Amino acid sequence: MALRFPRFSQGLAQDPTTRRIWFGIATAHDFESHDDITEERLYQNIFASHFGQLAIIFLWTSGNLFHVAWQGNFESWVQDPLHVRPIAHAIWDPHFGQPAVEAFTRGGAPGPVNIAYSGVYQWWYTIGLRTNEDLYTGALFLLFLSAISLIAGWLHLQPKWKPSVSWFKNAESRLNHHLSGLFGVSSLAWTGHLVHVAIPGSRGEYVRWNNFLDVLPHPQGLGPLFTGQWNLYAQNPDSSSHLFGTSQGAGTAILTLLGGFHPQTQSLWLTDIAHHHLAIAFIFLVAGHMYRTNFGIGHSMKDLLEAHIPPGGRLGRGHKGLYDTINNSIHFQLGLALASLGVITSLVAQHMYSLPAYAFIAQDFTTQAALYTHHQYIAGFIMTGAFAHGAIFFIRDYNPEQNEDNVLARMLDHKEAIISHLSWASLFLGFHTLGLYVHNDVMLAFGTPEKQILIEPIFAQWIQSAHGKTSYGFDVLLSSTTGPAFNAGRSIWLPGWLNAVNENSNSLFLTIGPGDFLVHHAIALGLHTTTLILVKGALDARGSKLMPDKKDFGYSFPCDGPGRGGTCDISAWDAFYLAVFWMLNTIGWVTFYWHWKHITLWQGNVSQFNESSTYLMGWLRDYLWLNSSQLINGYNPFGMNSLSVWAWMFLFGHLVWATGFMFLISWRGYWQELIETLAWAHERTPLANLIRWRDKPVALSIVQARLVGLAHFSVGYIFTYAAFLIASTSGKFG
């Protein structure tokens, strides 16, 4: 009996129902709630699991490299990146008939293969990899790192190597390690790789370990560094006629500030990228040495925060008490980390397409669409997680005495003002945006399109103009040839930048109009509503006027029983649950907008987006319906094509999504009755009744069923859109 799952909770292990299994899985990673957990063991478990996480990441990336080297066509892709389709891996599928085998045999492969839409080929090519042998070497190296990570994780669980709690709470040393050690040194190392391997590679020079010490990255070597003539490293950059990967038109510069894109690859100049990473390395190496560690010099985080008291008294005691609050709360730290990572991930999505860093990736339209969508959805999940852990912090870790009248306490004190302002903004955006869309729909339905309300986004156009876009006719800042800003940058980075901003073949500063104005406000509605739900969930997590003792019920509770009306659906978990639906909806609008705008740009018919995006029927008919034709007809009685797998996934995604509603709409009683009927039938059926179970089958709890429903809704939603996105883009552009 003692060994029953879950071993970390004796109470659950003795539960006689199937609740034991589901609750066990649900709380397996909630180390804080486990029996006889100590603060020390908590920190050590989390620390060790980080190494496990790293091992999985290294193993996964190793697998990417290995499969492309084994089954891909990297070497032939390198010869002609614009016309050879990159292969991710082979497909072994006994279900394939002859038509399917033919349809999926592409990219010069001997059998059926999957095409890569992840951009790894462009990335590996840009950083200097050229042969399958290079890929195998990389795969082996990552496998080695994976093994090292596993060993490190195991080692730090052994008594001799277990770090103490004080080690984990040494904030200054951690900043030193992360800022200088991880960000600084890795950025410097990456600059080194770009300068020594990638840039020579882009100029036709193959640098590997055997000639690494013989090939000078710059003709003058380290001379200019030691004599202070750093500008020499920027002289003689690659010319605009440079053919990437060859010496034709190549220069000798290694650290430049050219601005704009390489004309052939349509990606940022590698020498600009190296310069950027060197600057980042310098900033982080300095930043990591600003805090007091072993030598008694530098800032103490605690002293900094204690001193942050605004002189006017408007923020009370300012940051007093925050150091201990944050440093002693893992949830607060995780919330901060997730919020930062979520913002960064969304920024990655925006910058990967507008300022592509990898050679030729801008011309691989399906990859561009897939990467944008992928990073935006991940950002959404990470951001909602940040608020979830913020709410858990308020329930489990927040100490009112420690934070009296500081910024954290004051935020809780005026939460009503925060929540009601967010509510007002959401209502305003929602009614006005929907009102405009619906008005325009009615005008089109009644045959008077000229009566639409179309608003030009003049402020956004002015901002684009200030950064150098000339087509709107605002003569301002960088779009004004007489301004000081224009003249200051004219000889350095501006020619490349201005050329890129005003060139209509890339995605930098797309021309915007009334359709963009409307969808921008629809997205703003989604963002504000998602934020409203998340912020309210966190600020009301400890208690509200309706339920002042809420924190005593924990993070996720269904209700406080039948005797106390109105306590259902108000746990912090419920807020997270509701917010995820809004998050998915919002990112749906974001990705619809991005994709439709770009499809029309790539096809050269931007007027379709401009004319149809100002009313809802335009979105439904000219974006969703028009682009789903390949999916709706993916496989039929007359055969199939290479899009059929996406057509199947489109259907399957809808199925998973719809299954979610089965868990979201019906409640426990229905399932409990059904389960008891099925158990009765099972026990009376010959042969079947030979199989017995130890746990009495019971329905999922309300919170669990919501989680299962939410998971199906999310996964189905994303599967459906992924299939639509990849099929509609690759079907048009190959």
Swiss-Prot record:
One of its GO terms (molecular function) is chlorophyll binding. Keywords: 4Fe-4S, Chlorophyll, Chloroplast, Chromophore, Electron transport, Iron, Iron-sulfur, Magnesium, Membrane, Metal-binding, Oxidoreductase, Photosynthesis, Photosystem I, Plastid, Thylakoid, Transmembrane, Transmembrane helix, Transport. Pfam families: PsaA_PsaB. Chlorophyll a B3 binds at M662, Y670. Chlorophyll a B1 binds at H654. PROSITE patterns: PHOTOSYSTEM_I_PSAAB (PS00419). It comes from the Eukaryota. The keyword Magnesium applies. GO terms for biological process: photosynthesis. It catalyses: reduced [plastocyanin] + hnu + oxidized [2Fe-2S]-[ferredoxin] = oxidized [plastocyanin] + reduced [2Fe-2S]-[ferredoxin]. Belongs to the PsaA/PsaB family. PsaA and PsaB bind P700, the primary electron donor of photosystem I (PSI), as well as the electron acceptors A0, A1 and FX. PSI is a plastocyanin-ferredoxin oxidoreductase, converting photonic excitation into a charge separation, which transfers an electron from the donor P700 chlorophyll pair to the spectroscopically characterized acceptors A0, A1, FX, FA and FB in turn. Oxidized P700 is reduced on the lumenal side of the thylakoid membrane by plastocyanin. NCBIfam families: psaB (TIGR01336). HAMAP family: PSI_PsaB. This is Photosystem I P700 chlorophyll a apoprotein A2.
